Amino acid sequence: MVELDLSAPLDRHRATVLPEWIDWNGHMNVGFYVVAFDKATDTLCEQFGCSWDYTRQEIGMTFVLEAHVTYDREVTQGDPLRITTQILDHDAKRLHFIHAMYHATEGYLAATNELMLMNIDYASRRSAPWPDFARERIEKLAAAHKPLPVPEQAGRIIAIKRKK
């Protein structure tokens, strides 16, 4: 298991916008934002011991229950990305968090991805409490992130705002 990183927010994931991620508008396609964020989720899961080894050893797995992406500013081919992660809440089976994608050299916010992740028992494929090793680490991460302000993108719903 990796050494627990209690930086707040978690700031461990880096990526580069690949040529195949570019759409006909000349910027990163919406689906590849999700790919980049999914890799950042893998980085988060490594922090509490529920990564690929967790599934490969037939202990359990994690499923995304809900996801919301905001697209704040374009990124293009070759742009370096820095993705941070903030734990918003957790319970015995679930983890609520938000990723923020930044242009790694220019520093602007490109997108966010808010997720609800659930622990799944490998054998039953049903929800299950986090194993003790994961729960303990999640609690430490959540405590480290608790003082952070909740990002304005968290909890958003999709709607057209009408002027009254």
Predicted regions and their residues:
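A generic structural motif
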Residues: 72, 102-104, 120
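Beta-strand initiation motifs
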Residues: 8, 108-110
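Short, small/polar residue-rich loop motifs at catalytic or cofactor-binding pockets
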Residues: 15, 94-96, 114
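A structural microfeature
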Residues: 111-113, 129
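Hydrophobic beta-strand-centered segment that forms part of the acyl-chain substrate-binding groove
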Residues: 44-95
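Compact nucleic-acid interaction/catalytic patches
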Residues: 92-102, 108
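Hot-dog-fold acyl-thioester-processing enzymes
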Residues: 1-64, 118-164
